[in-house]
Amino acid sequence: MRKIIQEKLNEGKVLHFSLFDPDKVDLESIYSIALKLVESGTSGFLIGGTLGVSKEKLDSIIEILEDFEVPKIIFPSNVNLITEKADAILFMSLLNSDDIYYITGAQLIAAPIIKKLKLESLPTGYIIVGHGGTAAHVGKARVIPYDNIELIVAYSIMAELFGMDFVYLEAGSGAPEPIRPSVISITKKYLENSKIIVGGGIRNEEIAKELALAGADIIVTGNIIEQNLEKALKIVKEISNIRR
């Protein structure tokens, strides 16, 4: 998956990932929603959520998505959300957590399981900014203010120096505003290899385009897919047409 993602980015594309929260999604409608997202240009599916997620439902969603050629990637909140049915897993460390469990503890428990399942891992530095939402509360994150560019950049550089392939800047599910394009632009200048993933609070194609042009490599939307699919499809189409 890492190679596929990198090849697309090397072509100058900006990628869109659709996030499905197993606790919120309707299994009966997910196939038709996924079909529209793929037809609009989404590059991958992230499956996961912070609360109320069972492995059984995670497996069910991935099985429904099997017909689609785009990657199915686990977006884990804990060690119980690991399945061999996925193509890969975001092997995330919540870098600005005050609880070591979310920095290296859960990862220590998960690592042998991931190895045994031969599941491809995508090393990711997860950094919660601004609103933070449920993920910040559960993960005991020391949330970075939207305008503290210096701290966001420092955490991002740290992720890259740790050898992480991705820096995931997260404003939180349902955030009142997304991470600012100016923050992305400045952060991008300091990263040589790590790719920037941005999620949270992205509600229209205009802000998605601004984030993409500012330097985001992958843009994630989740809530908007559940709340207003037509708007979500516009975002996907806008991103899939961008070349840098």
Swiss-Prot record:
It catalyses: sn-glycerol 1-phosphate + (2E,6E,10E)-geranylgeranyl diphosphate = sn-3-O-(geranylgeranyl)glycerol 1-phosphate + diphosphate. One of its GO terms (cellular component) is cytoplasm. Sn-glycerol 1-phosphate binds at residues 168-174, 200-201, 222-223. Signal peptide: none annotated. This is Geranylgeranylglyceryl phosphate synthase. The keyword Heme does not apply. Its EC number is 2.5.1.41. SUPFAM superfamilies: FMN-linked oxidoreductases (SSF51395). The lineage of its organism: Archaea, Thermoproteota, Thermoprotei, Sulfolobales, Sulfolobaceae. It comes from Sulfurisphaera tokodaii (strain DSM 16993 / JCM 10545 / NBRC 100140 / 7) (Sulfolobus tokodaii). It is found in: Cytoplasm. Its main location: cytoplasm. Keywords: Cytoplasm, Lipid biosynthesis, Lipid metabolism, Magnesium, Metal-binding, Phospholipid biosynthesis, Phospholipid metabolism, Transferase. InterPro entries: GGGP/HepGP_synthase_I, GGGP/HepGP_synthase_sf, GGGP_HepGP_synthase, GGGP_synth. Belongs to the GGGP/HepGP synthase family. Group II subfamily. GO terms for molecular function: magnesium ion binding; phosphoglycerol geranylgeranyltransferase activity. The keyword Transferase applies. It holds the Pfam family PcrB. HAMAP family: GGGP_HepGP_synthase (MF_00112). Pathway: Membrane lipid metabolism; glycerophospholipid metabolism. It comes from the Archaea. Mg(2+) binds at residues 21, 50. One of its GO terms (biological process) is glycerophospholipid biosynthetic process. Prenyltransferase that catalyzes the transfer of the geranylgeranyl moiety of geranylgeranyl diphosphate (GGPP) to the C3 hydroxyl of sn-glycerol-1-phosphate (G1P). This reaction is the first ether-bond-formation step in the biosynthesis of archaeal membrane lipids. Its cofactor is Mg(2+).
